[in-house]
Design a protein with these regions (language model features):
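Cytosolic regulatory regions of ion transport systems
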Residues: 1-457
Length: 457
């Protein structure tokens, strides 16, 4: 696939790195700043073009006439919209994806049409990140939570702790412990190495486990891997930007929320927008302020400022002052590494990985509803809808055990008529099924796409 990325910022460069894992992708990236392109050209097999991504002359230099997809992730919504307009009007590019963050535009979906602003898919990072954080807040004990089939089923990442029921026991015993719980382990990592999640695989302390489960069964399933955690009630948010405000609005009716914002005008704005949240104007690294506001009784501390450095520092401070759990929003790898090494940041949220996952679902062939990138882009969880009949589809009418799946691809579950069916070997695939799979190696995606595509008669 020939892909043109406009903007080599954090999202654009991360997307380029992820897409380069697939040798079949031919990637070109455009940016006005040469210094943003140099490291990408040095480390990745891509073409770079220095210039303004909305100018026709620059687009033509980048080879837009032969592109299958244009992805506009420049640091301006207006630039992204103009670039997509150019791609559509002048070059008839079939698929245009743009990052749009301004609420004023998002509230008027009628402007995103072929007659106005021809953008096929809108990516709104703040909304994606807010929903991602909501999933973690709703499931204490989970490191990551990914929705499939409108939240009916979720993929959960957690770690196995010593002294819990399944540690040092084979996976097959899970069903004995929880006969009424719909869940299945689909992926397992030990010391950063993938381990086949077979029925006789023994779970060890510290294993990173991914399991699929019905939403209302997740809390029960988590107890198999770690000590039960109480729900989060008192939540402290550092940073009142778009994400901090969105999270507070989402949670304030069901949780005790405090939000701290450095800017006086912004703090005033937050107090007008939030109904059941205590807004504090001050510095999130102010130890006395945190103590005065009862940080030692805080169930969850969310560091959501625009600064990686601030998020890491205030998370460490909050944990050492008594906060039960800390989550930090971190873009750059160097700060993510520091946060992990500190031992005081429980969960690191990568906004770029979340945004990239939102984009990837629009790049897959077939009827791909959801894509979630795992393990820094090396693995992937996907939801594909099956179409056709036994004549036009290689999978319809086949049992899961008979599917010619590539090595390392696991069918974890099937959603049929809004009912969750776990991926048992004898389950027969039907038209309309939503297949939930995990690919241990993202490079297998083309084999999976080809298998599930409906063939023309």
């Amino acid at each position: 696939m020939k892909i043109l990325i406009l903007g080599a910022g954090q999202v654009g460069s991360t997307l380029a790195r992820y897409l380069c894992l697939d040798d079949d992708n031919d990637i070109t990236i455009v940016d006005q700043k040469e210094e943003m392109l140099t490291p990408l050209q040095r480390h990745l097999d891509i073409k770079t073009v220095n210039g303004y991504g909305a100018y026709p002359s620059v687009l033509e230099k980048a080879g837009i006439k032969s592109m299958d997809v244009v992805i506009a992730v420049m640091n301006s919504d207006e630039r992204n919209m103009v670039a997509c307009r150019m791609a559509h009007t002048l070059y008839d590019v079939k698929k245009k994806i743009a990052r749009i963050r301004t609420t004023e535009y998002l509230l008027r979906p009628e402007i995103f049409t072929n007659d106005a602003l021809p953008i096929d898919f809108l990516i709104t990072p703040e909304n994606l990140i807010t929903e991602y954080i909501r999933g973690i807040v709703e499931e204490p004990g989970a490191s990551q939570v990914f929705d499939f089939e409108n939240g009916l089923v979720q993929l959960v990442e957690t770690r196995a702790f010593v002294g819990t029921p399944i540690v040092n026991r084979p996976i097959k015993e899970l069903q004995e412990h929880m006969p009424d719980v719909k869940m299945r382990i689909v992926s397992l990592y030990r010391n950063e190495r993938a381990i086949p999640a077979k029925s006789d695989t023994v779970i060890r302390e510290g294993d990173q486990v991914y399991f699929l489960a019905k939403k209302n069964h997740i809390s029960r399933a988590l107890k198999e891997f770690r000590r039960a955690e109480n729900d989060y009630h008192k939540i402290f948010i550092a940073g009142g930007g778009s994400i901090g405000l969105n999270v507070a609005q989402l949670l304030e009716d069901s949780h005790n929320i405090r939000i701290i914002e450095l800017g006086e005008e912004r703090a005033k704005y937050l107090s007008e927008k939030l109904n059941n949240t205590i807004v504090l104007q001050g510095n999130a690294s102010d130890e006395d302020l945190l103590k005065d506001e009862g940080i030692e009784n805080t169930d969850l501390f969310l560091a959501l400022t625009d600064s990686d450095e601030v998020n890491v520092i205030v998370s460490i401070l909050a944990k050492r002052l008594g906060a039960h759990k800390t989550i930090a929003l971190v873009k750059r790898d160097v700060y993510a590494s520091l946060a992990e090494q500190s031992g005081d940041v429980d969960i690191i949220v990568s906004p770029d990985q979340i945004t990239v996952s939102g984009i990837l679902s629009h790049l897959r062939k077939g009827d791909c509803m959801k894509v979630h990138s795992l393990q820094h882009g090396k693995s992937e969880a996907i939801e594909i809808v099956v179409h056709g009949d036994e004549k036009t589809s290689e999978v319809i009418g086949e049992q899961i055990k008979d599917l010619p799946l590539p090595e390392g691809v696991v069918v974890g579950a099937v959603v049929r008529d809004n009912e969750l069916l776990m991926g048992s070997k004898k389950l027969v695939i039907e038209s309309g099924d939503h297949i939930l799979m995990v690919l241990m190696d993202v490079r297998k995606i083309h084999e999976v796409e080809a298998l599930f595509l409906e063939n023309e008669q």
